[in-house]
Amino acid sequence: MAVEMFYDDDADLSIIQGRKVAVIGYGSQGHAHSLSLRDSGVQVKVGLKEGSKSREKVTEQGLEVDTPAEVAKWADVIMLLAPDTAQAEIFTNDIEPNLEDGNALFFGHGLNIHFGLIKPPANVTVGMVAPKGPGHLVRRQFVDGKGVPCLIAIDQDPKGEGQALALSYAAAIGGARAGVIKTTFKEETETDLFGEQAVLCGGTEELVKTGFEVMVEAGYAPEMAYFEVLHELKLIVDLMYEGGIARMNYSVSDTAEFGGYLSGPRVIDADTKERMRAILKDIQDGTFVKRLVANVEGGNKELEDLRKKNAEHPIEVTGKKLRDLMSWVDRPITETA
């Protein structure tokens, strides 16, 4: 089924320019949204709790900052870009008491609305504007006169103005220059979670670790295994990112291409596909989100235990040692400290 697409000519920038926008959160997306909205002639304030380390950065970049409650009271459009696991508390404590008839509550991801963790009053427009790229790219493309494609969705539309407002917002951060895709909260949330869990984060991570283990257990040096299953992954992903699977296969050697065709289906087979379907079902029926909420309510104990176990995998020890040899690789603070 073809998606519905919109561009700058379909958007009325004056709609969002006539509103007061509160952006709650100043992480990757928060800073990109806030600065680009301001540069598009929109009134913007940033909401951050007292004592937040980001407050100084906000003022240095010429934006006004106040508490989430105060900016929510001031604004008529509120974009909630805090982490998923913090949003419900922020909504309950800071946003909901300050919502007025006709306000709009926007999100950059649909999880809390789709799974009912946040339930806005019926007289509020609920929408989503979600750039399909990290915040630094969203901002850089905007400054360069370009844009990153965006998704928009509307969950509640009491006044029938939700889509026009979301499209105007997307245009103000550069999204309509590239293209805006209309979706639903359900589709965005479930596809995003599935991609993260089955392929991008969970699936890729386990594939890499298992490949490393097989090689080391067969007697190969851990350093050789690291190079072959992790380090070179970037080369392959970059080719796929630029031109799809066909570009990758065109660019690698005939030996690599032929071997991939033969052995790939032996690794990812029909049983794997069934397990992927089970993962998707857990997402769709709320099983995953219930576990996510339980983890947060338990003080993130399960997440911390999983992080600790992951950090102890031999591939991490080997990788840290090898990355010391790579002057061209940006090192995370945790490795350079």
From Swiss-Prot:
Mg(2+) 2 binds at D192, E228, E232. Keywords: Amino-acid biosynthesis, Branched-chain amino acid biosynthesis, Magnesium, Metal-binding, NADP, Oxidoreductase. The active site is at H109. Substrate binds at S253. It comes from the Bacteria. GO terms for biological process: isoleucine biosynthetic process; L-valine biosynthetic process. Belongs to the ketol-acid reductoisomerase family. This is Ketol-acid reductoisomerase (NADP(+)). It comes from Mycobacterium sp. (strain KMS).
